[in-house]
Amino acid sequence: MSGEVSHRAGFVAEEAVARIYERADRPVTARRWRGAAGEIDLIARDGAEVIFIEVKKSKSHAAAAARLSRRQMERIYGAASEFLAGEPLGQLTASRFDVALVDGMGRIEIIENAFAA
């Protein structure tokens, strides 16, 4: 996949995942939020809880899951920490890290609490 096609496919996958969260009354409050440590694909809220969502797209859900590296998780943690610093409760804010896997057919599997800080 070329860079532009890959970028567009990632954007479409993120929008589809955002719609799932929105339909579940978990409003998406930020898309592609960038801090000094890295980028978070989507940030949603479930009441007072902040949900950091990493979207992975590949041929299969297993292949998508395999694309999430330890190094990438560390960058997500760092960016999430920066984001939480701006919350009223700071690092004490309830939060979780979800991973949304999107396969080649556009099917979405969401893994809540996929990894922990």
From Swiss-Prot:
Classification via InterPro entries: Restrct_endonuc-II-like, tRNA_endonuc-like_dom_sf, UPF0102_YraN-like
Signal sequence extent: none
Coiled coil: none
Gene3D superfamilies reported in the protein's UniProt record: 3.40.1350.10
Domain of life (superkingdom): Bacteria
GO terms, molecular function: nucleic acid binding
Xref: NCBIfam families: PRK14676.1
Similarity annotation: Belongs to the UPF0102 family.
UniProt cross-references to HAMAP family, sorted A to Z: UPF0102 (MF_00048)
Protein name, per record: UPF0102 protein Rsph17025_0472
Species this protein is from: Cereibacter sphaeroides (strain ATCC 17025 / ATH 2.4.3) (Rhodobacter sphaeroides)
